[in-house]
Amino acid sequence: MNDFLPAIYLSFLVALLAGTAIFIVRQILRTRKTESRLSQLQNKLKKEKGTAQEYYELGTLYLDKKLYVQATKLFQKALSTKEEVEPENRALVYNALGFTHFAQQQYDLAVRQYKEALKLNPEYVKALNNLGHVYERKQLVAPALEAYEQSLQYEPNNATAKRRAEALRKRSVTSS
């Protein structure tokens, strides 16, 4: 029995180290891919005008890195390109722009961008959830609840909207 204990311990340790190594290698590969794409887009957009898609993609990469000011500029460029962009895609850009403002605690600007996204795509559930979240941060319970309920009309199983709407209902009942 005592002879197996070190073997079990070593097996466990090797398995743990192998799992950790696999995780680290996957993270490195993912980061390299992201950094490569970031570098590609930066170089291309320095040399020539880009498409709305390229500005949006680079803005999203900056957003992931929490470089909100740079992301905001790129999303604005994506919106100001002269090419014809589908309303659903423009809604994505407005939503991302709203998120950059939200992350910088510029809640009024975030609301404006989310509403622009919803003008272009009224059934855009993510924008409705984001709008509800902004209203919550501004302590505006009624509009927040309305945004979440509207989100649930389009996507009844939306976990975020369900959870936040229920929390707001409980909060409004206890405060009454």
Indicate where each model-derived feature is located.
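Canonical positions in the second alpha-helix
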Residues: 44, 78, 116-117, 150-151
